[in-house]
Regions:
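Serine-hydrolase catalytic machinery in alpha/beta-hydrolase-like enzymes
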Residues: 31, 36-42, 52-155, 252-254
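Gly/Ala-rich beta-loop-alpha elbow adjacent to hydrolase catalytic centers
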Residues: 168-172, 176
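Acidic catalytic loop of the alpha/beta-hydrolase fold
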Residues: 216-221
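Alpha/beta-hydrolase fold nucleophile elbow
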Residues: 158-169
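Bacterial N-terminal signal peptides
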Residues: 10-21
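C-terminal catalytic histidine-bearing segment of alpha/beta-hydrolase fold enzymes
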Residues: 232, 237-281
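Short beta-strand/loop motif that positions the catalytic acidic residue
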Residues: 211-213
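A conserved short beta-strand
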Residues: 185-195
Length: 281
């Protein structure tokens, strides 16, 4: 009887271990906060953050850039976070912090650096509408040049591995996809509810692309099928997920659309981390 009783803790330990091992990535990954909780998440983060200025060669631009570091013993791959049409906000910084929590060096540049009033960036504009207009005035070649400077900075970090990816949202999602057509050394691109490049641009794409979309976002989703067809013809990887009932910007606006945005976020973020780890680690 005594021997049988002693087996119980061991059996329970085995059962617990099996339970932990069989948990899906979705059960173990923490999603970023919504826009509402972004500031608090940043204030309470235990990870190392810093602001740096990244010089862009052959220009007078110095990109004001937020960097979040993971807590890990070995070197980490780099993920460039490409802002929404609203510029470099607390929410984009909170996403970078969450990526660091998932093991990546996350770099979020303000692509409006030097283009705001008084030579400032996102924070210098008087209204969000002014920011939106300024972001929409940025040309794809300009953005590629800026992201190339950011990728070089990331590669120069002593704590970084050579592999890097982009994760973009809204306008930044489209830029993330386009950058994959312009930067052959990019290892992966994640597109959150961003439109797809032209058929002609897709011909030069190299890295795998993950696209995450809300079902109720026709302006964006209408561009998925043509891109998917072309990518298949080219033999390139383009994985897409369209989340039922979710709208544009679902990861930022998790509280909207009667839970559909939150459910989409709970599925999309683990898919993002799994994709990044597969292609960067």
């Amino acid at each position: 009887m005594v021997k049988k009783c002693r087996l119980v803790p061991s059996i329970l330990a085995v059962i617990f271990t099996l339970f932990v091992v069989t948990l899906s990535l979705a059960d173990r990954v923490v999603i970023p906060p919504s826009e509402i909780g972004a500031k608090a998440a940043l204030d309470n983060s235990v990870r190392h953050h810093e602001w740096v200025k990244i010089e862009v060669p052959a220009t007078d631009v110095q990109l004001n850039t937020f960097v979040a570091y993971p807590e890990r013993k070995d070197k980490a791959p780099v993920v460039i976070v490409v802002q929404e049409v609203y510029g470099l906000t607390d929410w984009i910084r909170a996403v970078a912090d969450r990526l660091a929590g998932d093991g990546f060096i996350a770099i979020a540049p303000d692509l409006l650096s030097g283009r705001g009033p008084g030579g400032g960036g996102t924070e210098a504009f008087a209204t969000r509408d002014d920011v939106v207009k300024a972001v929409r005035d940025l040309s794809p070649p300009y953005v590629v040049n800026m992201l190339n400077a950011v990728s070089r900075y990331g590669a120069s970090l002593s704590a970084a591995t050579p592999k890097f990816a982009t994760v973009g949202f809204c306008w930044g999602g489209a830029q993330s996809f386009y950058y994959a057509t312009a930067q052959p050394n990019l290892n992966a691109a994640v597109v959150y509810y961003g439109t797809s490049p032209t058929q002609e641009a897709l011909v030069t794409i190299r890295p795998p692309v993950l696209g995450l979309y809300g079902e109720d976002d026709a302006r964006v989703t209408i561009t998925i099928a043509p891109a998917a067809k072309k990518m298949k013809e080219l033999g390139k990887t383009y994985i897409t997920h369209i989340y039922k009932g979710a709208g544009h910007g679902f990861l930022r606006a998790q509280q909207e659309r009667d839970g559909a945005n939150l459910e989409a976020s709970r599925q999309a973020w683990p898919a993002t981390i799994e994709f990044l780890r597969k292609n960067l680690e």
